[in-house]
Amino acid sequence: MNISIVVVGKIKEKYLKLGIDEFKKRLSKYCKLEIIELDDEKAPENLSVKEMEIIKDKEGKKILGKIKHNSYVIALAIDGKGLSSEELAKTMSDLAVRGNSSLCFIIGGSLGLSDEVLGRADYRLSFSRMTFPHQMMRLILLEQIYRAYRINNGEPYHK
């Protein structure tokens, strides 16, 4: 399966880069992985609701421009559906069985995703009702994708 992760923002922390690189290496035996980093829009403090929407729309247009037309799109969204690791593994397996060879995960910037991006998503996935830094979510997502492949292949992985 081809998996792309479209993310707004760059990774600055070395410890996150190391973890991300480790899971990219581990995933290379299971899938073709592409991480597409997009520049985030500069957002000053104390934005109005309208200014937030403008920034999300600008980032959203960049995101939409990177989604392949045939991809099944999973947007990470706080209001999405929460899944266990086993349920994510089953979802990914079911998508492959149904002929989806391209899966695209989307991680928005600090303000979240635009309505247009959420509208394009085939599925909204929530890892928690809590908010996490989007850089950290990249590492957590990669770990969960790796765990899903291990589960689907009947391979041991710590719980």
From Swiss-Prot:
UniProt xrefs under SUPFAM superfamilies: alpha/beta knot
E.C. code: 2.1.1.177
Annotated S-adenosyl-L-methionine binding sites: L76, G108, F127, S128, R129, M130, T131, F132
Pfam families, per the entry: SPOUT_MTase
Transmembrane segments: none
InterPro entries found in the cross-reference section: Alpha/beta_knot_MTases, RlmH-like, tRNA_m1G_MTases_N
GO molecular function: rRNA (pseudouridine-N3-)-methyltransferase activity
Cell compartments where the protein resides: Cytoplasm
Domain of life: Bacteria
Alphabetical UniProt keywords: Cytoplasm, Methyltransferase, rRNA processing, S-adenosyl-L-methionine, Transferase
GO cellular component term, pick one: cytoplasm
Keyword presence, Cytoplasm: yes
Major subcellular location class: cytoplasm
UniProt catalytic activity: pseudouridine(1915) in 23S rRNA + S-adenosyl-L-methionine = N(3)-methylpseudouridine(1915) in 23S rRNA + S-adenosyl-L-homocysteine + H(+)
Family named by the database record: Belongs to the RNA methyltransferase RlmH family.
Subunit structure: Homodimer.
Known function: Specifically methylates the pseudouridine at position 1915 (m3Psi1915) in 23S rRNA.
The protein's name in its UniProt record: Ribosomal RNA large subunit methyltransferase H
Native organism: Clostridioides difficile (strain 630) (Peptoclostridium difficile)
Lineage start: Bacteria, Bacillati, Bacillota, Clostridia, Peptostreptococcales
Gene: rlmH
